[in-house]
Amino acid sequence: MSEQATSSGLESRSNGLRERNLQASKSAADRDVASQSLEDKLQVEEGEADTEKKTFGRTPDGTVFTVPPTRDMVSQLLSPSEPKNISDIFVLAILGCHILLLWFLPSSFRVAAFAVIFLFWRASYNIGIGWLLHMQSNGRTLVCWAKKSNIFVNPSTGQNPHPTLYKLLKWELETKISEQYSFEEAPTEYNTWLVFRRVVDLILMCDFTSYCLFAIACGGRPTGESFIMLALRWITGMSLVLFNLWVKLDAHRVVKDFAWYWGDFFYLIDQDLTFDGVFEMAPHPMYSVGYAGYYGISLMAASYKILFISILAHAAQFAFLVLVENPHIEKTYNAPPPRKRVADTDTKPQEDENSHEGSVVSDTLSSAPVIPPLQPSSMHSLLGLHNIDLYRSTDQSVLLAQVLFFALTTLTPSTPVYQFCFVLNAALWRIWYSVGIGYILNRQSNCKMWTRHFVKYGESNHEAWRQWKGTYHLSMTMTYASFIAAAWKMYSFPQDWRYGLVLLRHILGASLIALQIWTSTSIYESLGEFGWFFGDFFFDEFPKLTYSGIYRFLNNPERVLGLAGVWGAVLITSTKSVVFLALLSHTLTLAFIQLVERPHMQKLYGQSLRRDAGLVRSLKRSLPPSLKQIHGSVDKILDDSFEFIEEFIEAARPKLAAGVQTFVKDTSALFQKYPARVTISRLEPDLAGYDLKDYSITLEGTQPSRPAQFERASDKEGERARSMPYRRGEQENLMFEYGAPIKVKWTAPLNHSKKDWVGLYMVTDNTSREVTRVSSQGRWIATNQASFDSETCEQGLISSDIVLKSSRDDGEPRDVASGEMVFSGDKLWWTQGVFEFRYHHNGKHNVMAVSRPFEICIGRFDEDDIEVDNYGLVRAAVEAALLPVVQNCFDRDPEIAPQTVEEHYGCLVDRDGKYSKRVVFAVHHMFGIEFAPEVVRADGNIRNLAWRICNAKKVLAPYSMSRSNGASTPTAAHEED
């Protein structure tokens, strides 16, 4: 179910809770109330109390309504005291059919039949409901269906063609909700949600029932199982089922029916929401720990079939979360904050962290102020396969080391000698990763040892940071590569997968490995590149703690979950050597957290450190006082033990310092388009009633810069083609700016179809002028509102069906319908080329009119037309050229597009990579310099980006063939000199 719900006016906090932004205000009316008699005050307070008991909803168009109280699904269906209607009886009848099917089916068919039935209902849940919610989130499709069919309109108005369905829905919904609800007065969004709920009830109940019946069909007792194992299996299974039941009940207590049935896809509510209980224990508890009952039932049934189908269902639920719920939650509740406004820009230009050759770029380039970033730039990240850069020495070293490990692991025999060598190698790398890296960070925290070394040789703290990231990244990858290699050497394939617990061990081991991968990914998403590489050990000017993501539930997730994979390897291999490596890894990790991370965090953040995470707080609230005292005693024992270890290490430090320093010195130098879908459309039989001469499309847009218009007339052509072509007509070629909105004006007969639409295509995509055979890929706008089952197709529609006086070529007067629409943002092509608009008939692909072809182009920056000095380009001209282009790339949205060169980009630029990719594409064609999208996000404003372009131009100037940009090939005149 939807696990997060809020309303307009709710603001997202770092700890993940969403609370209403209440602003207390005093007015004259308040003072009048204060002067009333005591009786009047009591009446006012009672009225306010009654109002506070109500929940108010708000539709996207701003309509406010009272949200009636509703009952939960199980009570509605199974409680005899609840009134039943036709939909309840229908659901109960379907459930009864499932039970009867189990009773009457032969035992040989039960397992296969109920496996298919359960998979059908699971697909209906994750794929069916998922698709409906996805369409509702992006285009409000369900509400559009309801409005288009008029099923909620009173038949007495004559607009509802389904009076019987109207009466049935009215009786159904008012029977279920008897308080504070009126079918006629409720908004369409709320009524649509109520109907959607009934569909969800059917699918969820059948999904759970078919799963339980499938477990009954597969259940049994393994041969030779002892009574102790039987009791342990059932006790554990029942515990998991009861825990699952508590999770669901507590989650419903917190989020109520509104979020349980994804109400925020339809409307929002105005009320205080506090997320506690199970939502403090685990991320997405409804989909994570909320499926523990599946594994409990699998355990009680003692069937691998149940276990495998449970894993499949759980994976499908996570896919539903990632593909449907998370995007909607991000879009609805985590709106980007307002853009930062910079008033004082009298600062020095930022230094590129990846180069320190200051002599290459003239000091005059930094004469204008550049806004520095708040922390080290992460434009060239290290982690992730997509960030691998073979031009970077760190990535080269990592890849070569991995290839070497793979070759040694696969080409050497698994003899005891080799096994010992691999285990020893893994142990040494783990010791270095925890002890060696821990010592470096400890020295860096206390005396900036790492940074001082680079400053001694004239480097900056950014260079020290860059080298540290390479060292840590190489150490981390080598540690895990050596552990995997050792585990592989100790592993042997089982001869019989059905023997004992072999298969179960592999399943649990793989699950633990997947858990560690997910934990590491969540940690990286919460901390970012800066936190992952312990950036606050190197840059302590910005001490700020945020508990978001996985840190909302755990203070140190790497303490347990972060090492789940090594214990998964223990289960899979079942060897003492891997157990030793797992114990060593876990012990050293705990010591690293206690001796390195914790002291630094206390020193840097002090009292702002959180004592207990959400999970610990929940457990403490549920523990009896005696167990709480035991918990405190255990904490004291651990603290005393680590203090003893720390004192021991401090005493031995002088003996180890010289050797470690030598080791550090000796090793310091080591290191756009989706495929088009072909659509075949037949000519509509009613096209004969329309005159194509009544259809037309005209365009208006922003003209490109002067260099773009004259690029085709240059010295590249023959002598006769070096001037602009002579044009006999009055119309000139249509050329528009890259990313600029284009206004489309259309005309059509008065009786044109309300489902007509206009699409944008490349001229070369369609060979036929009568039928469009290529998908528009979302680049289309409907000519009329409420004609399609989506609101996205209406974005950009300005007007429609305005009657114009017109005349045909023969002089005959004729009235036509006209309209206007604007294509912008995602409805444009973000590339250069020749395009056209096509007017289509009746929701099909029959073409009624085609616009004039027009060209989208990016003019190259003309360096010869600007003033230059002895040091190169003037950055002000680059800034002036970039400003309109960047504004177009950011859809001219005032929330993200800068109005001046100093103004910061909106935060949405960091969240959605499409904006920065548009900018680097334009920069590449304007200046001939290719940047990574991360550069745009890291620079943060146009002034920084212009400085970086000038920097790149100056660095690349010696390799330019232009005399103004650098040394060119010597000529005869040079040779004579």
Curated annotation (Swiss-Prot):
Repeat among keywords: no
Please state the protein's primary subcellular location.
endoplasmic reticulum
Q: Which domain of life is it from?
A: Eukaryota
Which ranges make up the Lumenal topological domains here?
1-88, 134-198, 248-280, 325-397, 441-471, 520-562
Query: What are the GO BP annotations of this UniProt entry?
Result: methylation; phosphatidylcholine biosynthetic process
Q: What class of enzyme is it?
A: transferase
Where is it localised?
Answer: Endoplasmic reticulum membrane
Q: Its membrane topology, per UniProt?
A: Multi-pass membrane protein
Give the E.C. number(s). 2.1.1.17
Which Pfam families does the record cross-reference, listed alphabetically? PEMT
Got a GO cellular component term for this one? perinuclear endoplasmic reticulum
Ranges of compositional bias, category Basic and acidic residues: 28-55, 341-356, 712-724
Residue ranges with Polar residues bias: 1-15
Instruction: List the InterPro entries.
Output: Phopholipid_MeTrfase, Phosphatid-EA_MeTrfase_fun
Membrane side Cytoplasmic: residue ranges:
110-112, 220-226, 302-303, 419, 489-498, 584-977
Q: Where are the transmembrane segments?
A: 89-109, 113-133, 199-219, 227-247, 281-301, 304-324, 398-418, 420-440, 472-488, 499-519, 563-583
Which pathway does the UniProt entry assign to this protein?
Phospholipid metabolism; phosphatidylcholine biosynthesis
Q: Could you tell me what reaction this enzyme catalyses? A: a 1,2-diacyl-sn-glycero-3-phosphoethanolamine + S-adenosyl-L-methionine = a 1,2-diacyl-sn-glycero-3-phospho-N-methylethanolamine + S-adenosyl-L-homocysteine + H(+)
Q: Which UniProt keywords apply?
A: Endoplasmic reticulum, Lipid biosynthesis, Lipid metabolism, Membrane, Methyltransferase, Phospholipid biosynthesis, Phospholipid metabolism, S-adenosyl-L-methionine, Transferase, Transmembrane, Transmembrane helix
> Is Ribosomal protein included in the keywords of this UniProt record?
no
What does the protein in this record do? Catalyzes the first step of the methylation pathway of phosphatidylcholine biosynthesis, the SAM-dependent methylation of phosphatidylethanolamine (PE) to phosphatidylmonomethylethanolamine (PMME).
* Database matches in HAMAP family: PEMT (MF_03217)
Write out the similarity annotation.
Answer: Belongs to the class VI-like SAM-binding methyltransferase superfamily. CHO2 family.
What's the protein here called? Phosphatidylethanolamine N-methyltransferase
Question: What species does this protein belong to?
Answer: Ajellomyces dermatitidis (strain ER-3 / ATCC MYA-2586)
